[in-house]
Amino acid sequence: MTVVDPARFMYERNHFPSLTDKEFETLVLYCQMMNVQMVADYQNRKPDVIIKHLKSCRQKIGVESDFELYFIVINKFVNFERVFPELTSEQINILAAFSFYPKRSTIARRFDIYRCDIYDELIKIRNNLGIEDLESLRMLFFMKITVFL
C-alpha cells in the first residue's frame, strides 16, 4: 500500500491548529492505513503511543469515533460538493456514514433519524448518482474520494 507522507499535507495542517505535529502526523497516517499497528510500525513507535495520539486528536477535534475523525479529515482534504455535485450536504453525510458504518441502524442513531428514513434517503442518493444497487454506493464513495486525494 502506498502511503502519502504527512509532510505533503502542510496546507491541511492549518485546519487542525490544536494538534501537535506528532498528533497530526499520526492522524494523517491513521486515515490512510486505518490500522493502529501499521501506523506504529511505520513510525517505529509502540501501538500504545499511537492510541494515545488518536485519543488526543478525537478530544481536541471534538469527535467520538474513528469514523467521525476520518470524516472530518477527508472533509478538509476533499471538497465533497465538487466530488458529488448532485447531492446535498446532508446526503453526502449520509453517504459517508453508509460507507463506513456496517448497519443502517447505526447511521440512524448517529443522525437521530428513523432507520426507514435512512433507507429512503439512500435510495434517493442511489437514484441521483445513477447507481444500480446500494452496495455499489460504498465503492463509488471510496473511489471518488480516492481520486480527489
Swiss-Prot record:
Provide a GO biological process annotation.
regulation of DNA-templated transcription
- Protein origin, superkingdom: Bacteria
Q: What is its main location?
A: membrane
Supply the InterPro entries for this chain.
Sig_transdc_resp-reg_C-effctor, Tscrpt_reg_LuxR_C, WH-like_DNA-bd_sf
- Quote a single Gene Ontology cellular component term: plasma membrane
Q: Does the keyword Transcription apply?
A: yes
Provide the alphabetized UniProt keywords. Activator, Cell membrane, Conjugation, DNA-binding, Membrane, Plasmid, Transcription, Transcription regulation
GO molecular function terms noted in the UniProt entry: DNA binding
Localization in the cell: Cell membrane
Show the stretches that span the lipid bilayer.
none
Annotated protein name in UniProt: Protein TraJ
**Source species:** Escherichia coli
Q: Which gene encodes it?
A: traJ
